[in-house]
């Protein structure tokens, strides 16, 4: 059975939930009270959540670029952030 695509509301809720979980992980890691193995597991989960969030934000930015484009047929070019 194929997976259904998540609705924009579900994606937003998932993004917010992931961000909240990531903030909690950072707080636990910053406390310095976790045993090493647990801290490594938390760090790994945090990296996963950060990557997912980054991808979600990139997709949202691309959608905004498409919506603001004057030319409907203009190709979407990959986003390249300015690095300073």
From Swiss-Prot:
Example GO biological process: DNA catabolic process
Keyword terms: Cytoplasm, Exonuclease, Hydrolase, Nuclease
Subcellular location field: Cytoplasm
Catalysed transformations (reactions): Exonucleolytic cleavage in either 5'- to 3'- or 3'- to 5'-direction to yield nucleoside 5'-phosphates
Signal peptide: none
Molecular function per GO: exodeoxyribonuclease VII activity
Primary location: cytoplasm
E.C. number: 3.1.11.6
Gene Ontology cellular-component annotations: cytosol; exodeoxyribonuclease VII complex
PANTHER family hit by this protein: EXODEOXYRIBONUCLEASE 7 SMALL SUBUNIT (PTHR34137:SF1)
Similarity comment: Belongs to the XseB family.
Quaternary data: Heterooligomer composed of large and small subunits.
Role this protein plays: Bidirectionally degrades single-stranded DNA into large acid-insoluble oligonucleotides, which are then degraded further into small acid-soluble oligonucleotides.
Protein name: Exodeoxyribonuclease 7 small subunit
Source species: Yersinia enterocolitica serotype O:8 / biotype 1B (strain NCTC 13174 / 8081)
Originating gene: xseB
